């Protein structure tokens, strides 16, 4: 499946495909569509769940001070992320794109998981001891879930700290700072900063024997296909989960935008934790508005029915 910005109308029409026509009593239909914010009811569903799928987006990392590059202020220099995170942008100007990703890597090396990341990781560990399962499906490329201790983790859009050779295809972890000498001190995000225009031969290169090919970030760019094997594993998890928790995602990037609505269409409870409503909010059972680091931890903390181990 290809990574695309997802148009609101397309999402809503797909979510409601196959449902009965809306009632002519519009007030009643709207009332039925409104998700609950009753924490006790969510906690009851949480206590019963044996297989929980947690889907996370940029909002969960924003509280760690990670730039989201979305919304009105979502610019790096003069560009929005969707204008840099494409194969075409890299082909046209690999120096500029590498500056952008070098900046993001350097920022992330200074950031730590916040209470939401830690609560998810702790919950996974706790439930594992009870014979229950929690998996994390994240759109984020910052590795904060990994840093927090999440093990059942699907990073569907890749990682800032992995590179892929454009020649031999080799994928490797890379935590170097800077990633190459020419990028040292480069990547400042202010709009008046000029491009470094680094010669391509000085950009990150492959260290496989005899290759020396140009490296690129091992992330999924807009217009690229997600790893089919990874996506297949994710789909299996979504097909068997009995509770879905959506944290800090805008629900506008396809295909991840469809994950939770598809779970909801099975009649499985879905809870959204976000700073604001999203195009998918009305298809969910629960919606808890506010900072994820505040709203999520008490929601997935140890339930009174859980055995202490």
From Swiss-Prot:
In Pfam terms, one family for this protein is SIR2
Q: How is the cofactor bound?
A: Binds 1 zinc ion per subunit.
Query: Keyword Signal on this protein?
Result: no
Where in the numbering of this chain does the Deacetylase sirtuin-type domain appear?
Answer: 36-306
Name the coenzymes or cofactors required.
Zn(2+)
GO MF annotation terms: NAD+ binding; NAD-dependent protein lysine deacetylase activity; protein-glutaryllysine deglutarylase activity; protein-malonyllysine demalonylase activity; protein-succinyllysine desuccinylase activity; zinc ion binding
Transit peptide residues? Answer: 1-35
UniProt-annotated binding residues for Zn(2+) = 165, 168, 206, 211
Keyword Nuclease listed: no
Which parts of the sequence bind substrate?
Answer: 101, 104
Sorted alphabetically, the Gene Ontology cellular component annotations on this record are: cytosol; mitochondrion; nucleus
Where NAD(+) is bound, by residue?
57-76, 139-142, 248-250, 274-276, 292
Any idea of its EC number? 2.3.1.-
Subcellular location(s): the record lists:
Mitochondrion; Cytoplasm, Cytosol; Nucleus
Keywords for the protein's UniProt record, in alphabetical order: Cytoplasm, Metal-binding, Mitochondrion, NAD, Nucleus, Transferase, Transit peptide, Zinc
Tell me, what is an example of a GO biological process annotation in this record? peptidyl-lysine desuccinylation
Function, as annotated, reads: NAD-dependent lysine demalonylase, desuccinylase and deglutarylase that specifically removes malonyl, succinyl and glutaryl groups on target proteins. Has weak NAD-dependent protein deacetylase activity; however this activity may not be physiologically relevant in vivo.
Family the UniProt entry places it in: Belongs to the sirtuin family. Class III subfamily.
Q: What is this protein called?
A: NAD-dependent protein deacylase sirtuin-5, mitochondrial
Native source species: Xenopus tropicalis
As recorded in Swiss-Prot or TrEMBL, the protein's gene is named sirt5
């Amino acid at each position: 499946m290809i990574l695309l910005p997802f148009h609101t109308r397309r999402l809503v029409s797909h979510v409601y495909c196959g449902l009965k026509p809306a009632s002519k009593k519009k007030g009643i239909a709207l009332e039925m569509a409104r998700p609950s914010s009753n924490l006790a009811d969510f906690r009851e569903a949480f206590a019963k769940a044996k297989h929980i799928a947690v889907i996370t987006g940029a909002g969960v990392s924003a509280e760690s001070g990670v730039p989201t590059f979305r919304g009105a202020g979502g610019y790096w220099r003069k560009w929005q992320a969707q204008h840099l995170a494409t194969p075409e942008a890299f082909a046209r100007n690999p120096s500029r794109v590498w500056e952008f990703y070098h900046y993001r890597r350097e920022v992330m090396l200074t950031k730590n998981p916040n209470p939401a990341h830690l609560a998810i990781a702790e919950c996974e560990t706790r439930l594992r001891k009870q014979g229950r399962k929690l998996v994390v499906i994240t759109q984020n490329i910052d590795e904060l879930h990994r840093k927090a201790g999440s093990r059942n983790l699907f990073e569907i859009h890749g990682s800032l700290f992995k590179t892929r050779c454009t020649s031999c295809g080799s994928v490797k972890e890379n935590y170097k700072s800077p990633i190459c000498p020419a990028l040292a001190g480069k990547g400042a995000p202010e709009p008046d900063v000029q491009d470094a225009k680094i010669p391509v031969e000085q950009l990150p290169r492959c260290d496989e024997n005899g290759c020396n090919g140009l490296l690129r970030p091992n992330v999924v760019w807009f217009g690229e296909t997600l790893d089919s094997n990874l996506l297949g594993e994710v789909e299996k998890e979504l097909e068997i989960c009995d509770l879905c928790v959506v944290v800090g995602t805008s629900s506008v990037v396809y295909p991840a935008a469809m994950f939770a609505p598809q779970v909801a269409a099975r009649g499985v409870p879905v809870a959204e934790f976000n700073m604001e409503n999203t195009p998918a909010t009305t298809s969910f059972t629960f919606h808890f508005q506010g900072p994820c680091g505040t709203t999520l931890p008490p929601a997935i903390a140890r339930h009174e029915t859980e055995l202490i181990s």
